[in-house]
Amino acid sequence: MGKVVGIDLGTTNSVVAVMEGGKPAVIQNAEGFRTTPSVVAYTKTGDRLVGQIAKRQAVINPDNTFYSVKRFIGRRSEEVSEELKQVSYIVKTDSNGNIKLDCPSLKKEFASEEISAEVLRKLVDDASKYLGESVKQAVITVPAYFNDSQRQATKDAGRIAGLEVLRIINEPTAASLAYGLDKKNNETILVFDLGGGTFDVSVLEVGDGVFEVLSTSGDTHLGGDDFDDKIVQWLLKEFETEHSINLKSDRQALQRLTEASEKAKIELSNLSQTEINLPFLTATETGPKHLERSITRAKFEELCSDLINRVKIPVENALKDAKLDSSKIDEVVLVGGSTRIPAIQELVKRILNKTPNQTVNPDEVVAIGAAVQAGVLAGEVKDILLLDVTPLSLGVETLGGVTTRIIPRNTTIPTKKSEVFSTAVDNQPNVEIHVLQGEREFAKDNKSLGTFRLDGILPAPRGVPQIEVTFDIDANGILSVTAKDKGTGKEQSITITGASTLPSDEVERMVNEAQNSAKEDKEKRDKIDLKNQSDSLCYQSEKQLKELEGKIDDTNKNKISSMISELRNAINNENYDEMRDLNSKLQTALMDLGKSVYEKTSKEQTSTSSPTNSNDSVIDADFSETK
């Protein structure tokens, strides 16, 4: 088995880590940073940019720069109406209600999984270069409160990226692995994970290699992006009040405001006040308009008061489901960049009566935990037992539109449970199984995971046929459902017809497209490398000719000068075959030149050092000692 990496696929930033010498280590990306922005962009020429380079050009290319895509993965448009307002790119909906990201540069629409796959591919490519071997397997983290569709979509993203996803692991659980790896004493910990797009709380028992999740709760519509948006909306109002200009439809201005708001939020974690200066934000017939505003930490907390208060409910629910009060929590572990907000830290301290433990890096701890789980699966890490739970109840729709729960939330996984149902009318030939996820009493208020039919039920009075419905959740938290007629033995597994995950043939198409684009990317990169190498060779050759002026004959000098000119022409004309050929010939000619110069110099030195007059006579001398 090759190296298995752990990946924290984040809303704002992503991190990759690996076990090295029995210890988890974060892998730097090609740019030398430990975190990679979860941003993908397409230029006017169709080039794909991923990470920091994509984020840097977002202001001048807002329509083709995709960020915070994790908020859309595995979801329908009606589930993310607020999130859709926060991005500068165009989001569309297909005939099934699934989200598509419009890319004007390529005249193409992307699924969220495809964009996430590009981020994963970048992380894996950088890890492969670092490790010196191709990485094909990974453990990927997801928010604990992700539903089945979102988990399956994340797994699909891994597959599109060319990865075998060995395990989907919950982010708070991964953080607990990193925190408790060397802990021998038993502790009850609460992991408070506020990231860029989601919020999770998990209560765990940790100690001596056993990590048992007691409960989990969360809010997948709450994260750092929402805090940024509060500042953005405030700035929009301030600007409109001052200049009577509404910037809400100006995508470039919105992108600049979003970046400035994120920067201000980060600065206010350490400063009591910061400045937001955006010159030339827009222009009218009267001239350019600038934005200059000061924002205090108190003002920021006032703007975000409703968001800050929203974190209370999941914390209370997690404690309630774990049947614990705050006094039983030994440590509170903060995870996610948004936990650096002082008001969040104060709230945690107030509701749990405990100072949060800040010994772990909130940006890296999830990836480190994923690497530990990867090490367990690869056999590198021993004596660790991880017992996770399903975050939401699972059930089916029964008569009257009611949700009948089969697996309650916070059930330890993997698990398998069955319930027997019957027909509602006489001689009913089939039953439709509508699979649901959520805590509401009625089917219409819960998340629909899909429907399937069991046909061929023998004619019988209602209530007589016995239909056994089995729910099976694997270690990834992904569900499969079967229905079996106990009378005939006929069985049917779920076929998703309405869930917000991609059909298998669509995933297959994306996998093939990704493989082809990876090949094209390599060819394009090889050409760029060849061009740079040739340009560098021309420069070095010209430099060498100047240094050897007077030491080489005109024939060799003219020959190499001619080759340099030919190579420069090939570079300018982008003739890569000729470039490759001339590159090789010029290198050989330079080697021969160097060899001839060395031999010539060596002969001259030998000639100079030879004695001109040999005299072997010995001179006698008398020495006297003076005292």
Swiss-Prot record:
Domain of life: Eukaryota
SUPFAM superfamilies: Actin-like ATPase domain, Heat shock protein 70kD (HSP70), C-terminal subdomain, Heat shock protein 70kD (HSP70), peptide-binding domain
GO terms under cellular component: chloroplast
Subcellular location per the Swiss-Prot or TrEMBL entry: Plastid, Chloroplast
Keywords from the UniProt entry: ATP-binding, Chaperone, Chloroplast, Nucleotide-binding, Plastid
Molecular function GO labels: ATP binding; ATP-dependent protein folding chaperone; unfolded protein binding
Annotated region described as Disordered, given as residue ranges: 597-627
Keyword Chloroplast: yes
Annotated Pfam families: HSP70
Low complexity bias (residue ranges): 604-617
Protein purpose: Acts as a chaperone.
Protein family according to the UniProt entry: Belongs to the heat shock protein 70 family.
HAMAP family: DnaK
Stated name of the protein: Chaperone protein dnaK
Organism of origin: Guillardia theta
